[in-house]
Amino acid sequence: TVASQVDAAFEVLILTHGFSPVPSELRARARSLGVESLQLLTAEPGVPLGECLNLLVRASSGDVVAKMDDDDLYGPRYLSDQLHAMDYSGADVVGKQAHYMYLKGLDATILRFPEREHRYTDFVAGPTIMARRELAIGIPFPATSRGEDTAFLRNAAAAGATLYAADRFNFVQVRSDGGIAHTWDVTSSELLANSRVEFFGRNQGHIFW
């Protein structure tokens, strides 16, 4: 997903949590996919997720950092779309509030919060957080493993940062039977009750452009 990004210059930072892969294999794989800049970090199992994110932010070299979840799907223009939103909104943090979600157990794609796009906000979905690096350095993620995204957004807004919800496209959150990224307790029935079914299957051609 990262390697498929177009119209955006980027470096990839990967942090493995509690295990150490073979760097040469990862670098070879990255090169085969066209990724020119790759940094590999590791953290012990006891390091909270929020602190892992801070390690990645501090190791980055760009002006903007983007958090991407390997469980979810990102279209090839995801990064450029987010960067454009940051540019025209002037926001310090951008992301998706209106977004598609694929429910694996039902093979259905739903749309959540369709009215919450193209607007300034106080919340965006964690896997879509893109922030100015200077802000993420000054207001780090809390050293917790649950709620770190929400706390970061809340602290950023309290410090005067501007948050903007971009359009719904180029991102699909994937919900397996075990939950979203293994941190949500919400059920598929609850998600369906507060969303609308757009289509069965993934139909990424409608979402990615």
Which residues does each PLM region occupy?
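Short aromatic/hydrophobic "clamp" motif used to bind/position activated sugar donors
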Residues: 65
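Conserved donor NDP-sugar-binding/catalytic core segment of glycosyltransferases
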Residues: 77-108
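Short, acidic, metal-binding catalytic loop of nucleotide-sugar glycosyltransferases
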Residues: 1-9, 33
